[in-house]
Amino acid sequence: MKIIWIDGTFGIGKSAVAATIVKKIPQAHLLEFDALQEKYKPTSDSDRFGKRYPEAKKYLVDALVDEITEIIQEGGCNCLVIPVALINDYCNQKLIDGFANIESHHFILTAKTEILHQRINNQENRDIRFGSNLYARGNTVFK
């Protein structure tokens, strides 16, 4: 079993890249963090705050850990592909460090700020102002 983490800012194309990878690897499983967020829709004001502000999303990160653990225990796939923005130390500690005993590959996607703004503005069902103002500024290029 191995985990492939597809990381990057809002609108960078994590889901598209992950879907392509899953098609190329036999017995790979795609675990979409966006779908998990739908499964655990906000039911209280504090949950809604967490959905809007990633720093408050600890309950979603914990739910993702549970989903990953369940898939690993069930078996049936040799590779788990997870597109998710690992945006803070809590995410990294719970997800990357928490599965340190499993072979992992971590890819960080980047793009020019102008391209990110175009992608975000062209996406439906997204919080455009939030993505443009917060995440596009946080786009980091690692050299």
Regions found by a protein language model. Give the residues of each.
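Conserved phosphate-donor/acceptor-positioning beta-strand/loop module used by diverse small-molecule
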Residues: 100-121
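Conserved substrate/cofactor phosphate-moiety recognition/catalytic segment
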Residues: 18-66
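P-loop (Walker A) phosphate-binding loop of NTP-binding proteins
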Residues: 9
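Walker A/P-loop
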Residues: 15
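ATP-binding Walker
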Residues: 12
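Hydrophobic anchor at the beta1->P-loop junction of P-loop NTPases
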Residues: 6
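Glycine-rich phosphate-binding loop used to anchor ATP phosphates in small-molecule kinases
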Residues: 56-101
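Small-molecule kinase domains that catalyze NTP-dependent phosphoryl transfer to phosphate-bearing small molecules
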Residues: 122-143
